[in-house]
Amino acid sequence: MNHNIKKINHLIDTLGYEEAFLYLKQIPLDKINSKILEIFLRVCKNICKHQFAFNLLEQLSAKLNNNLIFLYQKALFLKDYGFVLQSIQILNSLRKKNIHPEERKKIYYLIGEILWKSNRFNLALKFYLFFQKQYPNEYQISRNVLICHSNLGNFDGASSQLTILKKINPFDCGEDYRVVTQLKKFTHLSDPYIDEIKSLLAKDLNSNSKSQLLFALGKIYEDLSDYQQSANYYKEANNLKNIEYANFSIQKKIDQFENLKKVFNQKFLQSSKTSNLCKSFFIVGMPRSGTTLLENILSSCEQISPGGELSTYSKYFNTIYQYRFNNSYKNFSENITQKDLEDIGSFYNDEINRMYKSNYIINKLPHNFLYTGFISRSFKNTKIIHCTRDKNDVLLSIYKNFFAGRLLDFVYNTDNLKNYYQFYLDVMAYWAKVLDDNSIFELNYEKLIESPETELQLLFDYLEIKFDKKYLEFYKNSRGIKTLSINQANKKIYKDSKHKWKLFEPYMSELFS
């Protein structure tokens, strides 16, 4: 059996996933153990053989349904492809079995993660609170409870968890302070949070905690209308975070898109569109351009569910690119066909349909602007909404916030941020030039907040859904959100953020020049 595993890994390293898949298919079912299955599922994932993997798991269930490792692997695979309830059912059965406490803890974390990632924040919160009772001194559990309270806009709940976290580990609470301060409007310089944060900053903290505390102070002093002090803290926070992204290159982004553009020649544009019907509304643009506000409004319609920032399309796009075109943009641009895009659309639809039962789903990952043309060719009836906003307000709103993950690697440096913004404008101008006139609906943030009913009527006409004035009362929705806009999610449309950059201009001239 070890020989099999060595041979499979050798095939992957030398000949690629396709050859490894052909070899794996020849192994009899009764010879597939958990180690081989783990590799098999990874291979299937990398060459888009999802249906084969699902069938394989069902065939193995008869033999391995009491095997805890098999059940865990099955739950992980189902989680990755939108089978939320099935995955949780398996994990729930596993946590009740006689297993090692550390394995049970791992399962608890996974169940909470699945609930949270599928936007079931209330359920995730209830589960994490139950989990917390089992492990009261586990730092990450209390942090996850805090995050769920934050997603639901619950300052008191988040604040109480911060108190717990400070007792467990007082020197690693930077993120927790930042999250909690996002939920509160500060009105007095005597607020105890200010002294607490400044006291922590005087200690020997890691750079991540320190930068998050600085972002928190920037927000607090902005609330207090001390824009000079606020700007100083934001600059210090960004300078600290930018050290992690010293290798960022806008030229790499430009070169990448230049290769993508080569696909959209006249012959390709004249080819017939796919037959895939899409129930997603794609909202694209820069971060902090009004995408969350728009999602809140749209999801007030009973037919539309909020999906949040779904990376599903880019996941399948990149899998096809890596597998079929060997990670080569030249190979990709010269050989991609409409069939490849149809496959991406089919894979996307399968996963989205498993996750959501509504007529329409919102996918508001701003980064999808890079794939706008490909999205439009992957489906027959694509609806793409491009959110635009005053450039300087976008730059400021990005610069004064911390972003999780490494996708937004340009945000902590003023030159990188401005260069990326220009790159985004160039990309969207290109799509507007080559795509049909009605492919993209442009929604301007300033127009939306000034004349919401007029702008939304036009948008709903584009979406082919009847507009109702009650959608303007979106702030009455009780759903939670993951993004930085949580403190605005449950408020009416307001105009305070319009031209806010002018308040910071005297202290951040390098950002707006």
Model-found features: residue ranges?
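Phosphate-binding active sites in nucleotide-utilizing proteins
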Residues: 273-379, 387
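TPR alpha-solenoid repeat register
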Residues: 36, 70, 104-107, 141, ...
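Structural register within alpha-helical repeat arrays
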Residues: 7, 39-40, 74, 111, ...
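Conserved phosphate-donor/acceptor-positioning beta-strand/loop module used by diverse small-molecule
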Residues: 375-400
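PAPS-dependent sulfotransferases, especially Golgi type II membrane carbohydrate sulfotransferases
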Residues: 159-161, 177, 194-206, 214-280, ...
